Amino acid sequence: MTRVKRGYVARKRRKNIFTLTSGFQGAHSKLFRTANQQGMRALASSYRDRNRRKRDLRRLWITRINAAARNNGISYNKLIQNLYQNQILLNRKMLAQIALLDTNCFSTIMKKINE
C-alpha cells in the first residue's frame, strides 16, 4: 500500500479552524487544540443564542406593551384579550413598536378596543 502524508489536507483543516477563531485572544487563536475547542464552543453558543434571542425579544415586547397599556389604564392581559375579540391583527412586535414610537396611535388603538 502506498504512503499518504496528508500534508495538504491537515494544513487545510487547521487553517479553517484558525480562520474561525482568528479574533480570539491568546492561545485560543494560536494553538490548534484550544482553538478547535473554542471554535466548537463558539458555534454551539451562537446556535443556542439564536434561539434565545427570539425568546428575549418576545419578553421585551411584552414588557413594553404592558407598560404602555398600564399608562392607558388597562392591563396587558385585557389588552390582548380585547385585541382578539375585536379581531385586530397586530402582533406583539408591531404593538411594541407602535407603543414605543407613536403613543398617539397606541392610544387610538386602546380607544378602539375599549368601545
From Swiss-Prot:
Keyword RNA-binding listed? The answer is: yes
Q: Name one GO cellular component term.
A: chloroplast
Pfam families with a match to the protein in the record: Ribosomal_L20 (PF00453)
Please name the GO terms that the record assigns under molecular function: rRNA binding; structural constituent of ribosome
Q: Which domain of life is it from?
A: Eukaryota
| Localization in the cell | Plastid, Chloroplast
UniProt keyword Hydrolase present:
no
Q: Which organism is it from?
A: Physcomitrium patens
SS bond partners:
none
Its keywords, alphabetically, are: Chloroplast, Plastid, Ribonucleoprotein, Ribosomal protein, RNA-binding, rRNA-binding
Q: Which GO terms describe its biological process?
A: ribosomal large subunit assembly; translation
| Role according to the record | Binds directly to 23S ribosomal RNA and is necessary for the in vitro assembly process of the 50S ribosomal subunit. It is not involved in the protein synthesizing functions of that subunit.
Q: Where are the transmembrane segments?
A: none
Q: Which residues form a coiled coil?
A: none
Which family, according to UniProt? Answer: Belongs to the bacterial ribosomal protein bL20 family.
Task: Tell me the protein's name.
Answer: Large ribosomal subunit protein bL20c
Q: Which InterPro entries does the entry link to? A: Ribosomal_bL20 (IPR005813), RIBOSOMAL_L20_CS (IPR049946), Ribosomal_protein_bL20_C (IPR035566)
